[in-house]
Regions:
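Single conserved hydrophobic/aromatic residue that forms the stacking wall/gate
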Residues: 1-7, 11
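Thiamine diphosphate
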Residues: 9-160
Length: 160
C-alpha cells in the first residue's frame, strides 16, 4: 500500500489472473530480448512508456517490477544478467543505497558477468526545491523520453 498527499497516488497492488505476488520475487511485466529495465514503485508506468519508445526504434525491452527491494530477487537477477548485455535500474530513489545500489552490490559479488549496469535515479542529495512529482522527475531525468535516450545510448555503446 502506498499513500501520498495526492488522491490519485493511493493504490494497493493485487495479483491479476495467474500472477503470484510474493515478497522477494520480482514480476516480469514485459518480455523483450535486447535490454532489461528493472524498476519499482510508481515509476513503473514511466519505465513501460520508455520501453515502448525503445520498441519504436527496434529495441525489444524486458521490464522487471521489483515490488520489494529486500529481500532482493537474486534468482531473477542471475537470469537477467546472464541474458542481457545492458541492464538498467530505474528508480525514484538515490542511485546510492536504493534498488540500484543493492543490484550493484549483488553484481560485484558475481563471477565474470560481462554486462553494462546502468543506474538511473536521483542524486545523493536533498532536493532543496519545491515542486510536483512531475517536476522532480524531470529535474532528475526520470521521464520516459530521457530514460529511453540514456538506455539507447548505453545499448549503442555496448554494441560497438
Amino acid at each position: 500500500l502506498r499513500h501520498s498527499s495526492a488522491a490519485s497516488d493511493v493504490y494497493k497492488r493485487q495479483a491479476k489472473n495467474d500472477d503470484k505476488f510474493e515478497i522477494g520475487r520480482s514480476i516480469t511485466v514485459r518480455a523483450g530480448s535486447d535490454i532489461c529495465l528493472i524498476s519499482t514503485g510508481t515509476l513503473l508506468p514511466t519505465v513501460m512508456e520508455a520501453a515502448s519508445k525503445l520498441a519504436l526504434q527496434g529495441i525489444t525491452v524486458r521490464v522487471e517490477s521489483f515490488h520489494t527491494i529486500k529481500p532482493l530477487d537474486e534468482e531473477k537477477l542471475s537470469d537477467v544478467f546472464s541474458r542481457y548485455s545492458v541492464v538498467a535500474v530505474i528508480e525514484e530513489l538515490s542511485r546510492i543505497s536504493g534498488l540500484g545500489g543493492n543490484v550493484a552490490e549483488w553484481l560485484s559479488r558475481q563471477d565474470r558477468m560481462k554486462v553494462r549496469l546502468f543506474l538511473c535515479g536521483t542524486d545523493d542529495e536533498f532536493m532543496h526545491e519545491v515542486g510536483t512529482q512531475h517536476y522532480a522527475r524531470a529535474k532528475y531525468g526520470l521521464t520516459a523520453e530521457n530514460i529511453a535516450h540514456k538506455v539507447l545510448d548505453a545499448h549503442s555503446k555496448r554494441a560497438r
